[in-house]
Amino acid sequence: MPKTNEPSRPTPPTSSREDGGGGSSVHPANVLNELSGEEWLYFTKSVWSTAYPSELGHERRRAHGANKPPRLMARLIEFFTRTGELVLDPFAGVGGTLLGAAIARGPRRAIGFEIEPRWVRIFETVVAEALASRDGEGPLLADLGPADPGGPRRFDPSGIELRLGDALELLPTLAEASIDFVATDPPYNVQLRQTMAGGPLAARFPNRRTDYAMVTNDPADLANSADYGAYLDRMGCVFGELARVLRPGRYAVVIVRDAYQDGRYVFTAADLAARAAAAGLVPKGDLIWYQAGTRLRPYGYPRVFVPNIAHQHILVFRKEARRSRRGERGGRPAR
């Protein structure tokens, strides 16, 4: 079980990446991660276009309509942490973040919270199957290019744990400044019972129907908030807890999708960014994640414009370290 009552101990920087780094050395001043300069630069592109294959139990995980690819989460984890550091996902779903920690080049520890028992069971099944894959040698991942070369990958779930419960109840159990990185995919908005064509329109426009359904009956589920304002208020409480448990100088990533509800576009990412900033998490970037192959639906056709939202926002925040009287931290200018 990952420990949260003491700071983790990062592994000293290595001289080069053993897999996927092209032999490029790690800069001796790099204390954030174990990436080469080339890998670091590639990560900072503000638009990511991905088409992930079905791997790591995707056929099971896809039951969750917003499951996140472990390869994507591993990429984030490898940039914002070092081997052995502790990652938190307070809205873990079927465990994409935890699986990403287990396949990271240099495994990380990870804690996840999930309110829905069904998703926890799926995660546990996926872990068991991944451990048994290729006679215990770990998964064989597809080559996705220089940013994610794939190949044989060690699967080490010994440091990951998914806890069943409400994030707002479990977050206070974590020690202050005990987490090295937060990576999460919260409910995007208040769930609507009907987001596509229904009733008499369902028969006429079957291509507008969807099997996307993740609504729980638990009132603690943020997606069951009374309205959008209540949802934002509860997310503000979450951000306050994340700012408390995150170590100074470390990062939090929140993946969120804007919405179109009641005839208007909802800038959910901007609203959540404002709540995070109010809680003390400083905005550092917005990486646009475009999921190639997203199915397009004729929502407003043939009368009005309604967007097909095929991208998500990977919002990057930082809990700034305290500055000295000279406006510096750790002997270096704050950035």
Residue ranges and their predicted role:
Residues 2-335:
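Class I S-adenosyl-L-methionine-dependent methyltransferase catalytic core
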